[in-house]
């Protein structure tokens, strides 16, 4: 266990003017308070806050943060009080220690709710001071390092919580090394067999390639030294969780992975980053499509680096990251590292510096949005979503900021503002221009929702939205509209039925008959009659028990099969009732489900089109799973486009021609759909055969292949394939990208 003077010395190495008195007092106080307490492992409990403090010294944090780490469990697990800590260490440290205290005594309905409330308190505390986050992550990291002594069920619960919340939170805040270690430790307990298998394979691969990695490292170092660039080069290997996740999400085998090894180049200045990049690209061939400049355009979590991929000496792909040493420290420690470079020579606290970073700004915005909810379990699920997905930020005409997931549409925006606005939405202006409701919103868009009181959200909207709130509201509104429709039809049916029976009718007259009909209210009766579940004669008899039905029934005068009544709904049971097409009460829209294909022609699996108009796919095609839209072509019917088609820009100013359509695929569908893939491959023997083998292994048919451009190192080609759906197409593209022969592969739209 680290001694008192050793802790002070660790901090002095990076902060010579350390407040030794504060560290010594916190060390002694925490040690005395925890006393003889033991951890599950049998170690003294004080060893835990001491290890948490040690993790934070590795991140070069100030003595106040180290003191908070030493004290973080005292209020929860000892006789220490907030008042006592305030008196000894000041109210600021007392407040942060209390912010780290778990909620064990809440009267909540489930373990999940307790977890959610703990997380809510943590996030709200983080929003006030980033040091709460740093201590909590270090606390979780040490607990994960010692998780093996716990019961199996507790290990699994803590590991899953770490993978779901703490690892992505560390990543969002730019603390990549901590994120990776948390993921690896969690992976080990969540799926031990997979962890062991991947770890063993990586060890074998490292041993096999050790000499090659050393050669590349030496070659790079010599090139930089020869050109006067002071650089350090080190090889790196993907972590087991990263490898396993890629295999799972992209359907790849271990052998198909081609970027397990990479190199990190660290230099002194930004200018040296670009000089090093130029030397690398003039020495080796660059792989097209694999260059990313995060220095000129940093990531949301402040990560900055240049990424490029080259063809190495043995014609293998090698990924390189080029960054300054300052960028490397920020990539490793995230928000914590900003104090090292922005606070040198200053009396400011690191947490004040950290609140200026992009990553911390994101966290505050997320917390503001999430803290509005009251349901703790819903809060937990929403938090997980927010941690894992990118966001777009749009504005109302009055300047209110609305945060939405990437891929959101104006419909999502409308429901995010208010459910009533979503339900009454009929159109949208995006940046002053009327745009289709399926338009994907971008950062900074100003969205003005056009409303109508007569609007009812169509069920087809479900396929256009990206948020759970919008989807749930659409379902609720759709159910309500359908019930209202059936209720109106039931009202008309009963009016006619009571008229034929010679009995007076009103809604109030139905109330005495509710017990006999076993219905809860009058609206339930009307809807049941409208749906055909309840014969109108049963209702008349329930209200007037002495009534004798003398009408002609369907048994002696059957209706024609498939006849429709009002609202295009099948006639109610017990009555022959038909309204002619186009007559009073006829449906305003054609039921797409009733469309019957003409003999000899295959019906397109599309819903939402008029059966009287011809429908065709655009030249670039669309596959099931694509978000699609129909464009009305005067005199030529409807053309179906994938929503990402560049050709749709020609119709931006003609929203009246856009038609909401969706796929209508059933399990018996055996149709394949054409798609086009652009591939850039290494120009070497066997490359084409490997590409064809990937298509064949995935049960895809290549029906055309054309070479676009050929160079000594690379060749570009267009491949036309036939696939079942978007998932099938994406799997093929993913495996092409992972092939050692392929430098890039992407779908062609238009």
From Swiss-Prot:
One of its GO terms (cellular component) is plasma membrane. Signal peptide: none annotated. Coiled coil: none annotated. Residues 390-451 form the TGS domain. It is an enzyme of class 2 (transferase). It comes from the Bacteria. The keyword Disulfide bond does not apply. The keyword Kinase applies. Residues 676-750 form the ACT domain. Its EC number is 2.7.6.5. Belongs to the RelA/SpoT family. NCBIfam families: spoT_relA. Functions as a (p)ppGpp synthase. In eubacteria ppGpp (guanosine 3'-diphosphate 5'-diphosphate) is a mediator of the stringent response that coordinates a variety of cellular activities in response to changes in nutritional abundance. Plays a role in adaptation of Brucella to its intracellular host environment. This is GTP pyrophosphokinase rsh. The lineage of its organism: Bacteria, Pseudomonadati, Pseudomonadota, Alphaproteobacteria, Hyphomicrobiales. The gene is rsh.
